[in-house]
Amino acid sequence: MSQNSLRLVEDNSVDKTKALDAALSQIERAFGKGSIMRLGQNDQVVEIETVSTGSLSLDIALGVGGLPKGRIVEIYGPESSGKTTLALHTIAEAQKKGGICAFVDAEHALDPVYARKLGVDLENLLISQPDTGEQALEITDTLVRSGAIDVLVVDSVAALTPRAEIEGEMGDSLPGLQARLMSQALRKLTGSISRSNCMVIFINQIRMKIGVMFGSPETTTGGNALKFYASVRLDIRRIGSIKERDEVMGNQTRVKVVKNKLAPPFKQVEFDIMYGAGVSKVGELVDLGVKAGVVEKSGAWFSYNSQRLGQGRENAKQYLKDNPEVAREIETTLRQNAGLIAEQFLDDGGPEEDAAGAAEM
């Protein structure tokens, strides 16, 4: 009896293998070679290529060393929180590796002087300032399908005005028009983005939902489609000012990884964005160094390998600016301890704090 059942299982297994082979060959005949394959056959499919955000702490918090290529990323937050700055830093990092980048400026507000200060190569940056949302997304689709673009930024979703709204009268009610536009565009774009290995960053604004009694009343514009299609969603906020005497020199910024399909989400980091200079890398080295135990802090003094960096955080930052070789050494050590630091980020910004954000995913 047991031999008969064993033979039956073997026969079924052979039949299934034959049926699968026949199905695979039929699919390849109909849709071309490579339309279906076993995932383990091609190692490159598993590996995720990333681009640095320009912030060491955010790269570590993302879990894969930066923002993923071939995926959709959403950066959202209040006004003047650093959304465009973060996107421009990502463009600058991609250009350093020889990548070609594009910026679809739907807000018509890109400052080329500031972009250059952040390290963006303006001569090799493609820029478009479209008149309508349809035109912006059509340009985005064409650039992505070309396969030549590494990073494409759309600034911003809220400024993608549907053609019907532009051609209509002021005060016309056109409910759901922008949401439908985004939903259709993302359905078309998502396959091309994956095939071309192009990262598309959508910058988004915040709106308030009326009549919300419990949870966060905040929501992002353009409907729910982008929340689903995005592999990474970053919530960026200004939490304070950096002052030198009475003059404000920059912003203290907090970024929460609200959604992450590539690593554990709900991590949050804090860094400085200095006016006219962008993300303060030396400030991050001091803060992360103390967190990882690489930089020692005794009272107000900061030291590294028994060598004093300065009294007070600003003096320590200035020392690292003046001594780039020490800064490089600290950065190398921090990257080697990235796993331990990432766990501390998770402890700092747990899922309880981000329950509202997670509900929006």
Swiss-Prot record:
GO cellular-component term (any): cytosol
Protein name: Protein RecA
InterPro entries: AAA+_ATPase, DNA_recomb/repair_RecA, DNA_recomb/repair_RecA_CS, P-loop_NTPase, RecA-like_C, RecA-like_N, RecA_ATP-bd, RecA_C_sf
GO molecular function: ATP binding; ATP hydrolysis activity; ATP-dependent DNA damage sensor activity; damaged DNA binding; single-stranded DNA binding
Protein encoded by which gene: recA
Pfam family, one: RecA_C
Places the protein is found: Cytoplasm
Function field: Can catalyze the hydrolysis of ATP in the presence of single-stranded DNA, the ATP-dependent uptake of single-stranded DNA by duplex DNA, and the ATP-dependent hybridization of homologous single-stranded DNAs. It interacts with LexA causing its activation and leading to its autocatalytic cleavage.
SMART domains the UniProt entry points to: AAA
Stored SUPFAM superfamilies: P-loop containing nucleoside triphosphate hydrolases, RecA protein, C-terminal domain
Keyword set, alphabetical order: ATP-binding, Cytoplasm, DNA damage, DNA recombination, DNA repair, DNA-binding, Nucleotide-binding, SOS response
Signal peptide interval: none
UniProt-annotated binding residues for ATP: 77-84
Main location: cytoplasm
Family recorded in the similarity comment: Belongs to the RecA family.
GO biological process: DNA recombination; DNA repair; SOS response
